[in-house]
Structure formats: C-alpha cells, structure tokens
Swiss-Prot record:
Name of the molecule in the record: Putative nickel-responsive regulator
Domain of life: Archaea
Cofactor note: Binds 1 nickel ion per subunit.
Binding-site list for Ni(2+): 78, 89, 91, 97
GO biological process: regulation of DNA-templated transcription; response to nickel cation
Lineage: Archaea, Methanobacteriati, Methanobacteriota, Thermococci, Thermococcales
PANTHER family, per the entry: NICKEL-RESPONSIVE REGULATOR
Coiled-coil ranges (or none): none
Keyword Cell inner membrane: no
Length: 138
C-alpha cells in the first residue's frame, strides 16, 4: 500500500486540542489518528448511504418480566436470520438482562432491525453500533 503525504491547514487551537486528545488516547503520531478519523468518516458515510454492507452490534438492556418481551425479541431475531450472526445473553440481576446481537448486512436493513428491537416494550435502553466489514477500508 502506497502512503501519500499531504498538508492540512488548521487553526492553532484546534491542533493543540487534537494533539492533547491523541496523546491521551495513546496515538504515537497524528498520521495514525487522522487515518482512524478518515476510516470512521468513510464508514459513517457508507452507513448513511444505506446500500453498503456493514457489521455491528445492537445492545439492549431489558426487563425479562415485561409481558412478552423475551418472545418478541426472539421472534424478531428469527425474522432476520440472514443478518443476525449471533447473540449473547447476560443476566444482570433477577429482573434485567443484557442482550448483544451481532449483525451484518446492508446498512438500511441493519438500522431497520435495530429500530424494531430497541422499540419493543420492556427494552429499557439500547444502542446500535455500526462499523464497516473491513473489505473497503485500508
């Protein structure tokens, strides 16, 4: 892979803040931090476009005592067999469970799955986290 050097003009205060943050995060140089930001920018753009293949997790915290929430979660997961790769279930306490659903597919479809799962009655909190599949990232 060929590396290209280019210059960027930014306000001094912005660069100082950027340098402070990348040092806190343990980056060895600005180049690697900028490459990570560029990759993230590309992944988010592809996600918004909706037609690119992405991977991700849908994390949900729910009360399993809530009427039908477990059945509805399982039914919805079976509706998306092609996109749902796996799920992990953790008992948080006697009432609350954490479910992490690992997904892969077209961004629009993954967003649809997350919207349906996270809107179920009994789901207290949840979040969709998207990333690329790695195929198009350098």
């Amino acid at each position: 892979m060929k590396i290209i050097r280019f210059g960027v003009s930014v306000p001094e205060e912005l660069l100082e803040k950027f340098d402070q943050i990348i040092a806190e995060k343990g980056y060895v140089n600005r180049s690697e931090a900028i490459r990570d930001l560029m990759r993230d920018f590309i992944v988010r753009h592809e996600w918004e476009a909706g037609d690119k293949e992405v991977a991700g997790t849908i994390t949900m915290l729910y009360n399993h005592d809530e009427a039908d929430v477990v059945k509805e979660l399982l039914d919805l997961q079976h509706d998306y067999l092609n996109e749902i790769i796996s799920s992990i279930h953790v008992h948080m306490d006697e009432h609350n469970c954490l479910e992490v659903v690992i997904v892969k597919g077209k961004a629009k479809r993954i967003k649809e799955i997350a919207d349906r799962l996270l809107s179920l009655k009994g789901v207290k909190h949840g979040k969709l986290v998207m990333t690329g599949t790695g195929k198009e990232l350098v």
